[in-house]
Design a protein with these regions (language model features):
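One-carbon transfer enzymes
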Residues: 40-288
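Solvent-exposed loop and beta-edge segments used for protein-protein assembly and interaction
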Residues: 3, 29, 44-46
Length: 288
């Protein structure tokens, strides 16, 4: 381990006086230098949230001593906390169906270094030939077809691949299969979905065509954590785009794809950088 290494610390707990002082003192006593610190006090829930980036100077043993001492502080205040090397890449499994715009975008952003992650696999319910035009850059590809009769067996295989790859994060990149309550619970807080939001009245097939028929003036997308409540998990990122009466259904589909890919990428990046903390059914998202 290098003599100087940046680390990220995130924490949440019931709010009370002395939290910041205790954290800062512990880091200082172990020779750490705080580079960035953000915090939020939720008046509604009474919870305190913080994200701290710090430099650590010392050997591995000293780092373990820091973690040991910090765990005592965490116990005193009731922290839910994570401390990890900033350079450590989260392992990401991507699930996709026929629409590949989000998959293409995520792979491209990873390839150019915009998404600092370690892709461990792509699971699709369509064969590799469907994505023949995409250079997956060596990411393992798993074809798991699904029918109504085989859905539970297929989902068991999905979970097996996630476990075997030791994936930290699962991304539903326009994966058009609804996860069971059981799998959603297993992936709680680490499975991100992209949904065509701002179209709440248009469910089912061809939502953008339905929106066009109603003459909407805005379309958008929402990236959220997956829960057992379909498309109602804690929101991470959203965006919208203005629609004109001149726009055709194809225009709405095109604009919708663009919004979906950029919203999903932003949400994933924030998760990878530990900027998202859960606050009940909501999220606290610290700015970059």
């Amino acid at each position: 381990m290098p003599d100087t290494a940046q680390h990220i610390l995130t924490l949440s707990c019931p709010n009370r006086p002395g939290i910041v002082a205790a954290v800062a003192t512990c880091l200082f006593e172990h020779g750490c230098n705080i580079l960035d610190a953000q915090q939020f006090d939720s008046i509604e829930t009474g919870q305190f949230f913080a994200r701290i980036v710090f430099d650590r100077v010392g050997e591995t043993a000293k780092y373990e001593a820091l973690r040991t001492d910090f765990s005592r502080v965490a116990q005193d205040f009731g922290f839910k906390w994570l401390m990890r090397p900033r350079a450590e890449k989260k392992r990401v499994m991507i699930l996709v169906s026929k629409s590949d715009h989000c998959l293409v975008d995520l792979v491209y952003r990873w390839r150019i270094g915009e998404l600092d992650m370690a892709p461990v696999g792509i699971i699709a319910n369509h064969p590799r030939e469907t994505y023949a035009h995409i250079d997956l850059d060596g990411i393992p590809f798993h074809y798991l077809p699904v029918t109504r009769e085989t859905k539970m067996e297929q989902e068991a295989d999905v979970w097996r691949l996630i476990r075997e790859a030791q994936a930290d994060v699962v991304v539903l990149a326009r994966y058009m299969q609804v996860l069971s309550d059981g799998l959603a619970a297993k992936l709680s807080g680490r499975c991100i979905n992209i949904h065509h939001s701002f179209l709440p009245g248009f469910k089912g097939a061809k939502p953008y065509h339905q929106a066009h028929a109603r003459g909407v003036k805005l379309i958008g997308a929402t990236a959220h954590y997956v829960t057992s409540d379909l498309d109602e998990g804690p929101i991470i990122e959203q965006d919208v785009e203005t629609i004109s009466h001149r726009d055709t259904p194809d225009d709405l589909v095109r604009k919708g794809r663009d919004i979906e890919r950029r919203v999903l990428a932003r949400a994933l990046r924030k998760h990878l950088e530990d900027r998202v903390l859960l606050d009940g059914q909501k999220t606290v998202v610290f700015a970059d």
